[in-house]
């Protein structure tokens, strides 16, 4: 058997052999990330150092005093040095002020700007060239300032451009115009010097604009702070004056309280400044109802021949409660009226007129529509029979039993075609769970108006055991629907403009006002639009006036969170889980004459080291429900 040739056989070189003279590249000492980190930190340190140099130079120039010792004056031995950096600062400031005048401050501004750029991880390109430009710019600004001198003994007033600025201005003026101190030369030099310094500092136009905006914003904040301080002092002064007037015999006028009920906790004080600690409030939408939730399920009648669709008459006085809002049977609430408060009568609401109740159901027309609907479905290849018809105030439900083998998705996909063929605006098609029928909802030619009085006067609203019962309207069968808000963690009402959100909110509010007194239910209403909830201003159920300021709304919501936490703590003291159990426990203790106490540890016995417990009485009051409404 032949052996494979070895890769080293013969004089041939291996494929991986390195050519002669090739150098091996060594890996870098620092990785790219480490190098970038070191460069960034070095740039920040350089920027900090330049900023410190510029700041020190600015302080040296700012604390300049002509009486300090300098190289051109010999002061007394015990002279006081005013410069903050001592003798060195005095000599340096004297040299710069005497040479450049006010322009010397620009020498301190340039390194400060460079340091600011480096601290922001921005490079300063061509630093040597920019340094030369900075010197030239300072000299030209000194020329401009030299033409503004006065006859004062102060060198900054007599020679604001320093000796260098005066010499340059006079020399250039004599060279161009034959006379010293020409103002045109000084003006041109000042403009050119400003442009040169603009380039020397290394700032772009965008950065200059940003710095100007930040400066303006800082000045604006200082102005607002000053105004706030002045208004605070003014308010304190006015309050002190009012207090003094009351003490000297003025009439003591009591301001109305935000909370009108005596058995409730203190209402939130809506200050302009929100608290620091706040809680987040999570809103969860109620589950979207299915078609089956509003369809009345009746026993199916078997028939071998084609059955005439059964027309179910809409409900008259009978009503039903919504499945999701129906509470289990419980003890009736003790709805004792508050002192001086009476529940509003139904006479305040509009009586349901005959024209609004709708005309009597025309069963012949409904059967005709059922036959027409079967014909439309047959045109699209769907066979089936309409078993029942449920007319309602807004829509009419047709229960279609399709022929065996018909897919539900095929019928659901024909919704738009059914609407076109039936001359309807829209059609809703869905499967009724648990039954072999498909529900087809067609809008009525005339919509029935549902009035609140009809809902509140119904048996279900009066007899259903609920804590915060809401009248929501009618279902597709014409039966009233109520729900208990206490069973919902939150209730979110959403919809487009004109869809009835405001009507729904007002209906819910009135449902609570017609059922519960202020000592059982309190409201916090937030209406930044100042349109919908302002009509409830002044009702005794309000914990606070209707909140229209968004800042005060934040305070009100934070107060609500704190009140919720306090209630949880009080419930834990009594060992109950909800407000109803808490109030029932208090009523039971009050009826039995029992004093509610809590066993707490107050310390340890010094002799035995065992804990010492005491029974502390609990001063607890019944809690009302608090409903927060945000529009």
From Swiss-Prot:
Keyword Cell membrane found: yes
Places the protein is found: Cell inner membrane
Record organism: Azospirillum brasilense
InterPro entries documented for this protein: FtsK/SpoIIIE/SftA (IPR050206), FtsK_4TM (IPR025199), FtsK_alpha (IPR041027), FtsK_dom (IPR002543), P-loop_NTPase (IPR027417)
Gene3D superfamilies recorded: 3.30.980.40, P-loop containing nucleotide triphosphate hydrolases (3.40.50.300)
Domain FtsK span(s) in chain numbering: 478-631
Name of this chain's protein: DNA translocase FtsK
Family from the record: Belongs to the FtsK/SpoIIIE/SftA family.
Assembly and interaction partners: Homohexamer. Forms a ring that surrounds DNA.
């Amino acid at each position: 058997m032949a052996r494979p040739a070895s890769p080293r056989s013969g004089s041939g070189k291996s494929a991986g052999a390195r050519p002669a003279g090739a150098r091996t590249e060594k890996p870098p000492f620092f990785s790219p990330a480490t190098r970038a980190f070191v460069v960034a930190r070095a740039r920040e340190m350089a920027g900090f150092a330049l900023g410190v140099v510029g700041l020190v130079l600015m302080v040296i120039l700012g604390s300049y005093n002509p009486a300090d010792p300098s190289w051109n004056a010999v002061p007394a031995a015990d002279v006081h040095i005013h410069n903050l950096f001592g003798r060195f600062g005095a000599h340096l400031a004297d040299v710069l002020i005497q040479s450049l005048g006010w322009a010397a401050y620009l020498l301190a501004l340039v390194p400060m700007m460079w340091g600011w750029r480096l601290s922001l991880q921005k490079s300063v390109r061509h630093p040597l060239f920019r340094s030369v430009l900075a010197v030239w710019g300072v000299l030209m600004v000194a020329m401009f300032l030299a033409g503004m001198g006065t006859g004062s003994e102060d060198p900054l007033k007599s020679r604001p451009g320093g000796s260098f600025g005066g010499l340059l201005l006079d020399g250039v003026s004599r060279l161009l115009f034959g006379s010293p101190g020409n103002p045109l030369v000084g003006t041109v030099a000042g403009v050119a010097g400003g442009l040169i310094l603009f380039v020397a500092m290394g700032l772009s136009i965008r950065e200059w604009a940003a710095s100007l905006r930040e400066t303006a914003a800082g000045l604006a904040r200082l102005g607002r702070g000053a105004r706030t301080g002045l208004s605070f002092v003014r308010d304190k002064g006015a309050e002190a004056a009012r207090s003094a007037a009351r003490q000297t015999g003025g009439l003591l006028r009591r301001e109305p309280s935000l909370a009108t009920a005596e058995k409730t906790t203190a209402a939130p004080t809506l200050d302009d400044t929100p608290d620091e600690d706040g809680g987040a409030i999570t809103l969860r939408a109620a589950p979207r109802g299915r078609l089956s939730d509003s369809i009345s399920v009746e026993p199916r009648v078997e028939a071998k021949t084609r059955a005439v669709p059964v027309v179910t008459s809409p409900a008259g006085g009978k009503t039903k409660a919504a499945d999701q809002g129906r509470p289990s049977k419980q003890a009736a609430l003790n709805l004792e009226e508050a002192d001086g408060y009476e529940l509003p009568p139904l006479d305040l609401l509009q009586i349901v007129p005959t024209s609004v109740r709708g005309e009597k159901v025309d069963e012949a027309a409904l059967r005709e529509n059922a036959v027409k609907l079967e014909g439309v479905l047959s045109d699209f290849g769907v066979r089936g029979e309409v078993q029942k018809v449920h007319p309602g105030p807004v829509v009419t439900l047709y229960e279609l039993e399709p022929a065996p083998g018909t897919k539900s998705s095929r019928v659901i996909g024909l919704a738009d075609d059914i609407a076109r063929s039936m001359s309807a605006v829209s059609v809703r098609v869905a499967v009724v769970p648990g039954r072999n029928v498909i529900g087809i909802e067609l809008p009525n030619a005339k919509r029935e108006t549902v009035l609140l009085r009809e809902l509140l006067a119904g048996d279900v609203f009066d007899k259903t055991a609920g804590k915060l019962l809401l009248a929501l309207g009618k279902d597709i069968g014409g039966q009233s629907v109520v729900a208990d808000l206490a069973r919902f963690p939150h209730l979110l009402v959403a919809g487009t403009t004109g869809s009835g959100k405001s009507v729904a909110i007002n209906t819910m509010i009135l449902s609570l006002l017609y059922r519960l007194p202020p000592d059982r239910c309190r409201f916090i209403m937030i209406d930044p639009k100042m349109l919908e909830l302002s009509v409830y201003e002044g009702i005794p159920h309000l914990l606070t006036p209707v909140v229209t300021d968004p800042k005060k709304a934040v305070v009100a919501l934070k107060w609500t969170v704190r009140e919720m936490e306090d209630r949880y703590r009080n419930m834990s003291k009594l060992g109950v889980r909800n407000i109803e159990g808490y109030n029932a426990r208090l009523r039971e203790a009050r009826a039995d004459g029992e004093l509610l106490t809590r066993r707490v540890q107050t310390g340890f016995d010094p002799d035995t080291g065992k804990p010492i417990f005491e029974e502390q009485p609990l001063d607890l009051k019944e809690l009302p429900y608090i409903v927060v409404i945000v529009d």
